[in-house]
Amino acid sequence: MANSARDILVTCALPYANGAIHLGHLLEHIQADIWVRFQRMRGHKVHFICADDAHGTPIMLNADKLGITPEALIARSKADHVADFEGFNISYDNYHSTHSPENEALTAEMYKKLRANGFIKSRTISQLFDPEKGMFLPDRFVKGTCPKCKAEDQYGDNCEVCSSTYSPTELINPRSVVSGATPVLKESEHFFFDLPAFEGMLKAWIKSGSLQPEIANKMQEWFESGLQQWDISRDAPYFGFKIPDTEDKYFYVWLDAPIGYMASFKNLCDKTGLNFDDFWKKDSSAELYHFIGKDIVYFHSLFWPAMLDGCDLRKPTNVFAHGYVTVNGVKMSKSRGTFIQASTYLRHLAPEYLRYYYAAKLNNRIEDLDLNLEDFVQRLNADVVNKFVNLASRSAGFITKRFDGKLSAEIAEPELLAEFVEKAAQIATYYEEREFGKVVREVMQLADKANKYIDDKAPWVMAKEEGREAELQAVCSMALQLFRVLAIYLKPVIPQIIARAEAFLQDELTWESLNRPLLNHAILPFKALAQRLDPKQIEAIVNETKEQFVAQQALEQKNSAKAEPASQVEPIAETISIEDFAKLDLRVAKVMKCEAVPESNKLLRFELDLGDHTRQVFSGIKEAYNNPAELEGRFVVVIANLAPRKMRFGVSEGMILSAGTGGADLFLLNADQGVKPGMQVK
């Protein structure tokens, strides 16, 4: 048990109110919930909060597309998100929204304090403006040709093909993603948060030793490259909070989003009588932890603590970042049926299965977690059903049938029970350090010992022999005592299953009760705590996800056909001479190997045979070919004399030709039978 109760405030990153919760989101919420449940079992006062991130251009545009107000869209999203989290037994004390009176008041208050303290600057900037929609375009709402490698259909902030970063104004032939119009440059006054002013404070913070090493190392890289002032304003039209003392300026979503943590807690305080300042004042003794994904470390380790410090508020005790979820070793994919929504999963499987699997693979490092669907079935059946649940089922029946549900008055194997209970300190340390995989391994090792005890004693043999009733009761009672200890250890991970165990044991399983075995105690008849997984259940989830994707594509194509003119043929480029064409050395190449680049949303890595040598080429066709291995063995056309380009993932030694508008609409060029690797295209 803990020496004294701690006051702890825990948050998860705020899901964006513009889409469904999927299994990638759930990794973080399950991870945090397990940690919170453990802390509560140890007697600490934990307040677990979250909210929907409900502002920004994407929400405004999607609402317009759906013909509803942004308020209606975010209300619908919040209801869906709350239902999904409740379905997975995420034990939030409060789930709020950034589009709330509390958040609006806190955001304005903090902005005014930062401004008064000299940390808000203003200057005029030039931005791309959509003349048809009458709006400034965020980076991700502009597409065009990369100014570095000339790859088409690239976003306004970075190129997925060559990994270059640039400003939207550098794009060649830019176009608005919103309307398709050619944007124009327009000046506007913007407000900036003076992040460089906090460099000294942030450097001292990372030296405190409380942050994950990966985060501290990454922050050091950012310091070396130089901190920049942060644009915290957006121009109308924009769905968000208006900046005080302005007519048409709004807070950038990432300014008010983290303040949403405070707003959700303020909402909880108003409902329960908690003291808000006790948790947020500069000298607060309460602990504050943020569970986040690795993609938003920048905001939580730089901007957020700097904003808090600039307002004379406390900084987080720690920021816990995790990696992404992959499925079967690759990025989640809608077309493959692995981009699984929470609601789809819950229609087919119990939430405890995913909670257990994630826990079994989680550690305290920033590593991606692979959900291997075949391993998922095997592990759940082997661990939860065969080892844990079966330990109770093979013992409880004898107690209820032969002894009126009464456990023995004494412990048959005191030393064995003591061995199980003594593991509590180590398991508690693993929980505290978020080493959930180690918790699961430790518990399953104990489960193996408990099942070996049953196998060695063979109560089914005792039950057939006269005069061994007392021994039978003692052995089966001992097995249930061991099961009870394991159930206490697993309660933060699989609370729903353990609730059923508590019902049949007629005992509330607490960490404190580890040293209080159930002696001469009555139990109820055993009922199945968990069902075996059938691979067909996984197939059903995957198939339903694929069907959702097909239906979504059909709807988008239907809407696109209504909105777009019939002709989508690109105009012919300027005339070139035969000499210009002759400069290109086009060759036929055979695909020897093709694989996805995990760090990129668009790139595939090809190993090509050009007859007398092999080459590595990266191509941005990942969306069009989501099963790269199927390309192996086919022929493609390559620009062979293109200068090699060094990329973040390696050197690309050519360019593979394809036709189409980009994204999923790309098609590799085929060659007739009889061609050989290295043949020149003329």
Curated annotation (Swiss-Prot):
Its main location: cytoplasm. It catalyses: tRNA(Met) + L-methionine + ATP = L-methionyl-tRNA(Met) + AMP + diphosphate. InterPro entries: aa-tRNA-synth_I_CS, Anticodon_Met, Met-tRNA-synth_bsu_C, Met-tRNA_ligase_1, Met-tRNA_synth, Methionyl/Leucyl_tRNA_Synth, MetRS_core, MetRS_Zn. One of its GO terms (cellular component) is cytosol. Zn(2+) binds at residues 146, 149, 159, 162. Is required not only for elongation of protein synthesis but also for the initiation of all mRNA translation through initiator tRNA(fMet) aminoacylation. Its EC number is 6.1.1.10. Belongs to the class-I aminoacyl-tRNA synthetase family. MetG type 1 subfamily. One of its GO terms (biological process) is methionyl-tRNA aminoacylation. It comes from the Bacteria. It is an enzyme of class 6 (ligase). Residues 580-682 form the tRNA-binding domain. This is Methionine--tRNA ligase. Its cofactor is Zn(2+). NCBIfam families: metG (TIGR00398), metG_C_term (TIGR00399), PRK00133.1 (NF001100). Homodimer. Binds 1 zinc ion per subunit. The keyword Nucleotide-binding applies.
